[in-house]
């Protein structure tokens, strides 16, 4: 098998993985999204909350897999993709799986993720968001013969600056000195109840 060292090949592999995971875990019912590869220093991936792409007369979601973390083991990349697919499933079926503007993953997300091949752990701030592949998913990945994607975009210090010094992007080896906490703003914003 050829090494995945081109972005076009990486995107193609992720699209193929989406189709196989969709068939296996969702009976092929999820609409195929646009798969993008962009740096997201604070996350392994994300999905848009609405269908933001128009392609071939169809509106589509976007699932982004962070280009900075593509070179993780394939089971971790597949787990991230499946995590985002669970969000898509929840949006498509009307299940409210997050709160706090999509940041906090609630128990409904946990239930859906566990029903679709993921193991879920709790994070104090973000809820049931820490996902890893279940044994069944690992077996599925091995059966599919998926190979690691052998490329990843390195994060520069400027990429990290916007996320707060001291934060560490998943998969990166960069760290920084902690920033002092921001002082609370005394500015109040008034919104007219009739507008």
Please tell me what each predicted stretch does.
Residues 78-79, 110:
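An amphipathic alpha-helix signature
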Residues 79-92:
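Active-site recognition of the HExxH zinc-binding catalytic motif
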Residues 2-63, 67-71, 92-195:
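Metalloprotease/metallohydrolase-associated module, dominated by Zn2+-dependent proteases
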